[in-house]
């Protein structure tokens, strides 16, 4: 079959054979459906599938042209100095002449869509196809009524128990010079080898977590606390009472949050206690992330601001301190409030916490919250950029679980040297003695 000259093309040919990538909004049509029978590729003579980048071509030449243009390849003819005949059999032998033939045929680089645009285009076509067939996936149809009620209950619990302005956090201790009553134990003034080893580990724990604090008064005054440069003695404990007060305030909110949730109240009291003991720290960090400013590396808790001091220098600190890295990575996901509360629920209802009796019930509840989170993401974030968001969130929860274990060990070591935990902290973390 001969190739029709360009002058013989009519308007109908162009309208009905446009390529998906070349003209947004109009699907490509198979060349066999054209009036007049099958068409051939203007580049190599193979069977054409439609208009691609302004020219009737086969799928092979379409893909070749896209790849060559995206690579900005500089091709040279190894045979006849740019005069190779391009056919179906020879098209793979000389890329330079094949590209020349594509351009001479009228294929246009500017009609190539970006990878992101192609993904969005495919998603749109898939969505429209689903609408026509009436077989939409759950995420597109929307959440079930049960899932919507579940999210509403969690959001209501969050609103009732978490004040992001921290206006009720008033009765707290501020760091200062420790009184004589807080001197180091006599055993550490002349420590044994065992006590010296404990002291060394505690210093390591605290020195890696130097926290600066800023308090803004209602009259506009500002009070700053900076950790001492040389933490060789008792001054490294100066901020512990304040941090214990803040932690206790947050833990009380977490307990109230859990008690508002009907699924939690339906569990035996023994399981409620076990779940709270295991998840309190994790839920606390998820709430802290909502007030974390990634640009300044600061937790903005109303009039109080906390910042981890950079003891390692530059970006290294981000790698050395898992807690800080976690907050940066989670904040980068730009989660909705609904996604935060669902994360809290998934963390709270973990069936493998020590002491949990009704493993199966708790496991089913956790699965329901996880499925609801996945459905919420599919419904509210259809863009291709968010297709892995659910997996990223679940990975962050796994990382938080690991940080929780490290935090508990660190807290117990510090408590052993310098008791500072409040009664509620002692109860949650299983601290039996002072």
Curated annotation (Swiss-Prot):
Annotated SUPFAM superfamilies: Glucocorticoid receptor-like (DNA-binding domain), Nuclear receptor ligand-binding domain
Motif (Bipartite nuclear localization signal): 66-92
Tissues expressing the protein: Expressed in liver, colon and small intestine.
Domain NR LBD as annotated: residue spans: 146-433
Signal sequence, start to end: none
PROSITE patterns, alphabetized: NR_LBD (PS51843), NUCLEAR_REC_DBD_1 (PS00031), NUCLEAR_REC_DBD_2 (PS51030)
Reported effect, residue 122 to Q: In allele PXR*4
Keyword vocabulary terms for this entry: Activator, DNA-binding, Metal-binding, Nucleus, Receptor, Transcription, Transcription regulation, Zinc, Zinc-finger
Residue intervals of every NR C4-type zinc finger in the record: 41-61, 77-102
GO molecular function (one): RNA polymerase II cis-regulatory region sequence-specific DNA binding
DNA-binding region listed in the record: 38-107
UniProt binding sites for hyperforin: 247, 285-288, 407
Quaternary structure, from the entry: Heterodimer with RXR. Interacts with NCOA1. Interacts (via domain NR LBD) with CRY1 and CRY2 in a ligand-dependent manner.
Family: Belongs to the nuclear hormone receptor family. NR1 subfamily.
Stated role: Nuclear receptor that binds and is activated by variety of endogenous and xenobiotic compounds. Transcription factor that activates the transcription of multiple genes involved in the metabolism and secretion of potentially harmful xenobiotics, drugs and endogenous compounds. Activated by the antibiotic rifampicin and various plant metabolites, such as hyperforin, guggulipid, colupulone, and isoflavones. Response to specific ligands is species-specific. Activated by naturally occurring steroids, such as pregnenolone and progesterone.
Record's protein name: Nuclear receptor subfamily 1 group I member 2
Gene this chain is encoded by: NR1I2
């Amino acid at each position: 079959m001969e190739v029709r000259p360009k002058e013989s093309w009519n308007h109908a040919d162009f309208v009905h054979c446009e390529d998906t990538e070349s003209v947004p909004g109009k699907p490509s049509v198979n060349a066999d459906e054209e009036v007049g029978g099958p068409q051939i590729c203007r580049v190599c003579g193979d069977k054409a599938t439609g208009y691609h980048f302004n020219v009737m071509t086969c799928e092979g030449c379409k893909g070749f042209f896209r790849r060559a243009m995206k690579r900005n390849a500089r091709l040279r003819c190894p045979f006849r100095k740019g005069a190779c005949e391009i056919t179906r059999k020879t098209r793979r032998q000389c890329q330079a002449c094949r590209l020349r033939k594509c351009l001479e045929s009228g294929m246009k680089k500017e009609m190539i869509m970006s990878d992101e645009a192609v993904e969005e285009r495919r998603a749109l076509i898939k969505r429209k196809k689903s609408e026509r067939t009436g077989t939409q996936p759950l995420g597109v149809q929307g959440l079930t009524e049960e899932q919507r009620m579940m999210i509403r209950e969690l959001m209501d619990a969050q609103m009732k128990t978490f004040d992001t302005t921290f206006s009720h956090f008033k009765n707290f201790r501020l760091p200062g010079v420790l009184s004589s009553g807080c001197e180091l134990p006599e055993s550490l003034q002349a420590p044994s080898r065992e006590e010296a080893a404990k002291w060394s580990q505690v210093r390591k724990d605290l020195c890696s977590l130097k926290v600066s604090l800023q308090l803004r008064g209602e009259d506009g005054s500002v009070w700053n606390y900076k950790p001492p440069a040389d933490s060789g003695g008792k001054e490294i404990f100066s901020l512990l009472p304040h941090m214990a007060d803040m932690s206790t305030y947050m833990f009380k909110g977490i307990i109230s949050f859990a008690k508002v949730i009907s699924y939690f109240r339906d569990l035996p009291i023994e399981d409620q206690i076990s779940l709270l003991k295991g998840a309190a720290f994790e839920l606390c960090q998820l709430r802290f992330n909502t007030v974390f400013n990634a640009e300044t590396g600061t937790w903005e808790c109303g009039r109080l601001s906390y910042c981890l001091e950079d003891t390692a220098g530059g970006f290294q600190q981000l790698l050395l301190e898992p807690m800080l890295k976690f907050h940066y990575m989670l904040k980068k996901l730009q989660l909705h409030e609904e996604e935060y509360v669902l994360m809290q629920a998934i963390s709270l209802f973990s069936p493998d916490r020590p002491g949990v009796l009704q493993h199966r019930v708790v496991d089913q509840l956790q699965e329901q919250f996880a499925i609801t989170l996945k459905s919420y993401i599919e419904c509210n974030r259809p863009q291709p950029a968010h297709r892995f968001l659910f997996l990223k969130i679940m990975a962050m929860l796994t990382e938080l679980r690991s940080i929780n274990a490290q935090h508990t060990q660190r807290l117990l070591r510090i408590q052993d040297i310098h008791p500072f935990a409040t009664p509620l902290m002692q109860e949650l973390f299983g601290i039996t003695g002072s």
